[in-house]
């Protein structure tokens, strides 16, 4: 079993409280885990692995027109030094790769800190690989996730034949009835019952049918354990919708928070990194975009173009007004060019997909602004200009990774028939 407490994270079915120490966790994971990209050819043969922590890349040289110097046999012309930001991202985890359709050797890699990946695995109850062998004879290797998920070695399930569904008898009092259905897996006496569904209903007065049919009851749903909507409306205005951390329950708790003392009940989800924490130290805690050149059959096969860090504070402050609202120019008239940009940028940065980048699992979207500054008379599309579309937050650009997928996805879909899309596979 992993020693989670030594890494700054306390998780499992027995220890319920989580210790937040990103610095210690990041340092321990960097020394103990390795992530790499495995390169495949079009025939599906593994060629080599790109381990960023051990890679010593160089920056490619450019000609007078700004194009990368490349020879099919000699490879890329190298400048002799890696980008300045390379040391900031070489220990991060590659989670997604996209290929440039205009250049078969150019890739964009999305990198995130190791502790973020590790924390998300624990929070979502994903079992992690066992480290070493179990002590003692006959003892099973068991890995416990944050939600109590247990993974045992391969063995015959002798309790399968004893599995059955047990239900409590419904009880009625004062004109109300409630039913509860529970499931229990047979086996050892230490197994606990797992509640599958509990619905409380109440009778309406005069609900019995009087049309000669056998008495039928009309009941209305009063409460349902499976109908807890994650979106709650504000108290002051019925139109405002706000996502809160209390709406996302992913980890078990033994405390009686919220009036529920059940040790298996979910507790509010807590973010691993706050937005301000990421904003103050982008190189260490932010997600990063790495532009990578790789030619598998050349002598100088790997080169690094540039590294860009994503700032969630800037993204939430600038992107929603620009791609969710109608576009008007500085004269107050409808700008057809801006409308064209709006139609091209329909992607969005979802706080549920990457909740670790937001405070308390909450994203703010401002749909009242036009998205353009009044002093900006040009309103140029700068996202495809050299070095600016990844580094700066502009009023006419969606999130960076949405740009990559929006502009590259059609080409990648067509190229997938030739095996181009799956050239890289993340290995651990």
From Swiss-Prot:
Residues 12-22, 206-217 have a biased composition (Polar residues). Residues 157-171 have a biased composition (Basic and acidic residues). Residues 1-25, 157-219, 247-271 are annotated as: Disordered. It comes from the Bacteria. Transmembrane segments: none annotated. Disulfide bonds: none annotated. Residues 172-186 have a biased composition (Low complexity). Belongs to the adhesin P1 family. This is Uncharacterized protein MPN_101. The lineage of its organism: Bacteria, Bacillati, Mycoplasmatota, Mycoplasmoidales, Mycoplasmoidaceae.
């Amino acid at each position: 079993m992993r020693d989670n407490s030594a890494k700054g994270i306390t998780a499992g079915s027995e220890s319920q409280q989580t210790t937040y120490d990103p610095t210690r966790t990041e340092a321990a994971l960097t020394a103990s885990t390795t992530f790499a990209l495995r390169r495949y050819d079009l025939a599906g043969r593994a060629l080599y692995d790109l381990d960023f922590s051990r890679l010593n890349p160089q920056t490619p040289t450019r000609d007078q027109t700004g194009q990368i110097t490349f020879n099919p046999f000699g490879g890329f012309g190298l400048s002799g030094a890696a980008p300045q930001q390379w040391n900031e991202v070489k220990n991060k985890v590659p989670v997604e790769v996209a290929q440039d359709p205009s250049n078969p050797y150019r890739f964009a890699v999305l990198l995130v800190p190791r502790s973020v990946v590790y924390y998300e695995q624990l929070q979502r109850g994903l079992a992690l690989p066992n480290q070493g062998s179990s002590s003692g004879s006959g003892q099973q290797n068991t890995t416990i996730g944050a939600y109590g998920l247990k993974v045992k070695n391969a063995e015959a399930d002798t309790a399968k034949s004893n599995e059955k569904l047990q239900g409590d008898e419904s009880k009625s009092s004062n004109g109300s009835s409630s039913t509860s259905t529970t499931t229990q897996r047979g086996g050892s006496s230490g197994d606990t019952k797992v509640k599958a569904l509990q619905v409380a209903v109440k009778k309406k007065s005069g609900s019995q049918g009087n049309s000669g049919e056998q008495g039928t009851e009309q009941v209305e749903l009063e409460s349902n354990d499976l109908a807890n909507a994650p979106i709650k409306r504000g108290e002051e205005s019925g139109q405002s919708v706000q996502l809160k951390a209390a709406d996302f329950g992913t980890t078990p708790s033994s405390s009686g928070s919220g009036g529920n003392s059940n040790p298996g009940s979910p507790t509010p989800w807590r973010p691993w990194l706050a937005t301000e924490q990421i904003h103050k130290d982008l190189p260490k805690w932010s997600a990063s975009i790495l532009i990578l050149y790789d030619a598998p059959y050349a002598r100088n096969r790997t080169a690094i173009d540039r590294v860009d860090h994503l700032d969630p504070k800037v993204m939430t402050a600038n992107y929603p007004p620009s791609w969710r609202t109608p576009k008007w120019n500085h004269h107050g008239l409808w700008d057809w060019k801006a409308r064209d940009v709006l139609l091209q940028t329909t992607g969005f940065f979802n706080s549920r997909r990457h909740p670790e980048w937001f405070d308390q699992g909450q994203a703010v979207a401002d749909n009242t602004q036009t998205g353009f500054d009044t002093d900006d008379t040009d309103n140029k599309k700068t996202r495809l200009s050299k070095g600016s579309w990844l580094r700066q937050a502009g009023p006419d650009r969606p999130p960076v990774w949405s740009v990559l997928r929006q502009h590259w996805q059609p080409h990648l879909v067509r190229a997938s028939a030739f095996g181009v899309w799956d050239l890289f596979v993340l290995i651990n």
